[in-house]
């Protein structure tokens, strides 16, 4: 039995206290609050520092762990097709809701006050780019140059190619995959350390926001939080509910079945924390072990439905808050970019924030990366909605793909979801499929 963690030592509580202090300082001493801006800026720079290496490690390992493409390619193709279809739907739903509810309208933030030097740097290099230019820009001149300049799409291009190459290498590539996997763990260790500074960044950003723009801005930020939670709730029960029903099982009963994992995610704000438990339960539900072993870990990089919803809503919120008028074509272009950058989002606390920074950095200065300062104080409180939606989305995806592959014991699933205690699932032909190595923490 674990020792109970003191209430005040939880990051969630510390950020909440920091936000309250920032709001108080900004309201009572606006001039002093506005001077707290460097605290938020410093935290953003620390997060931006980690973007390229984290995307590189997570994407390479995620693709490489799919295993031998010749033998499990059918499952992989179906999984990737499902992931792209559902995450695209999540992005579009987020776009529709944020445009209908307009949570950022009325903030009237001057983007130049967020970080004038960086804004000038982005806008100076912004050019009207046609499709051919955009596609050519995705290809880096050099790999080192892509990392040095922080060109996220170029880093993604190299990462995908390397992941595919390691997959083709088979056993010879496992050492490299293992090293990169451990490297990604180390990177997230750094992120965990940086997230301890989140209260300081939240305090500085909130004090600056309230001091500069008034207490009324807090209402708009709270509205964004409500919009994200509402959209995730609707996505789970309407979209995933329809997918589950079409696939022959009850989403509600499935949620009851994985309630322990949902509560774990609620407490940690990380869907990764429930990965071992959800895999075990999916196997017990009747999904074949090889399908579970391939779909679940791949989904943790490629099927983050909650994160996709958040990314679209947050990006458009920043546009609304800074009075950047986006055309429909530009908003669809953001979705196109997010289809790429969201694949680098890790299912850990802070992953969505990192990916949002990566996305804004690819838009040629149209939206200021420094607009993230508006979200530091509330990002942590939206992570529960994202993480739980990610968890449920990956669980549903695994059951659906297992059924497509005829690797699902339908009768066993029915008994388990109805609360029966059937015997251990029998071995199936699918159990002979090569199972990709999966390391859990």
Swiss-Prot record:
GO biological process, one term: L-aspartate transmembrane transport
Membrane disposition: Multi-pass membrane protein
Region spans: Disordered: 416-441
Pfam families reported for this sequence: SDF
InterPro entries hit by this protein: C4_dicarb_transport, Na-dicarboxylate_symporter, Na-dicarboxylate_symporter_CS, Na:dicarbo_symporter_sf
Subcellular location: Cell inner membrane
Listed transmembrane segments: 13-33, 43-63, 80-100, 146-166, 188-208, 223-243, 309-329, 334-354
Record GO terms (molecular function): fumarate transmembrane transporter activity; malate:proton symporter activity; succinate transmembrane transporter activity
An example Gene Ontology CC term for this record: plasma membrane
Keyword annotations: Cell inner membrane, Cell membrane, Membrane, Symport, Transmembrane, Transmembrane helix, Transport
Main location: membrane
SUPFAM superfamilies: Proton glutamate symport protein (SSF118215)
Stated role: Responsible for the transport of dicarboxylates such as succinate, fumarate, and malate from the periplasm across the membrane.
HAMAP family: C4_dicarb_transport
Family named by the database record: Belongs to the dicarboxylate/amino acid:cation symporter (DAACS) (TC 2.A.23) family.
UniProt name for this protein: C4-dicarboxylate transport protein
Organism from which the protein derives: Chromobacterium violaceum (strain ATCC 12472 / DSM 30191 / JCM 1249 / CCUG 213 / NBRC 12614 / NCIMB 9131 / NCTC 9757 / MK)
Organism placement in taxonomy: Bacteria, Pseudomonadati, Pseudomonadota, Betaproteobacteria, Neisseriales
């Amino acid at each position: 039995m674990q020792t109970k963690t003191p209430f005040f030592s939880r990051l969630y509580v510390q950020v909440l206290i920091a936000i309250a202090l920032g709001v108080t300082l900004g309201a009572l001493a606006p001039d002093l609050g506005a001077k707290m801006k460097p605290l938020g800026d410093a935290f953003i720079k620390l997060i931006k520092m980690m973007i390229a290496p984290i995307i590189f490690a997570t994407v390479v390992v995620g693709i490489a762990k799919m295993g031998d493409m010749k033998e499990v390619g059918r499952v992989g193709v179906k999984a990737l097709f499902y992931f792209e279809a559902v995450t695209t739907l999540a992005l579009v739903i987020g776009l529709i809701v944020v445009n209908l509810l307009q949570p950022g309208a009325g903030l009237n933030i001057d983007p130049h006050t967020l970080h004038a030097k960086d804004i000038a740097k982005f806008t100076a290099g912004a050019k009207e780019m046609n499709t051919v230019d955009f596609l050519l820009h995705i290809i880096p001149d050099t790999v080192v140059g892509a990392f040095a300049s922080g060109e996220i799409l170029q880093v993604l291009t190299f990462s995908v190619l390397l992941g595919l190459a390691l997959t083709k290498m088979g056993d010879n590539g496992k050492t490299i995959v293992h090293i990169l996997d451990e490297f990604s763990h180390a990177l997230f260790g750094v992120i965990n350390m940086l997230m301890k500074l989140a209260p300081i960044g939240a305090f500085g950003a909130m004090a600056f926001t309230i001091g500069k723009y008034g207490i009324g801005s807090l209402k708009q930020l709270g509205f964004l939080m409500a919009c994200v939670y509402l959209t995730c709730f609707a996505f789970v029960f309407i979209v995933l509910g329809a997918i589950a029903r079409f696939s022959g099982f009850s989403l509600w009963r499935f949620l009851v079945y994985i309630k322990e994992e949902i509560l774990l995610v609620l407490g940690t704000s990380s869907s990764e924390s429930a990965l071992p438990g959800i895999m075990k339960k999916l196997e017990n539900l009747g999904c074949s072990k090889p399908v579970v072993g391939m779909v679940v870990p791949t989904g943790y990089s490629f099927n983050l439905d909650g994160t996709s919803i958040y990314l679209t809503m947050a990006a458009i919120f920043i546009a609304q808050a800074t009075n950047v008028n986006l055309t429909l074509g530009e908003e669809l272009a953001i979705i196109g970019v997010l289809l790429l950058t969201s694949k680098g989002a890790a299912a850990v606390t802070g992953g969505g924030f990192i990916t949002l920074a990566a996305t804004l950095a690819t838009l040629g200065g149209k939206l200021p990366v420094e607009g993230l300062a508006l979200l530091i104080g509330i990002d942590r409180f939206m992570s529960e909605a994202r993480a739980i939606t990610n968890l449920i989305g990956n669980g549903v995806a695994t059951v659906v793909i297992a059924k497509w592959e005829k690797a699902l014991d339908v009768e066993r699933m029915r008994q388990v979801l109805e609360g029966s205690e059937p015997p251990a699932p029998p071995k199936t032909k699918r159990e002979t499929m090569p199972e990709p190595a999966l390391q859990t923490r």
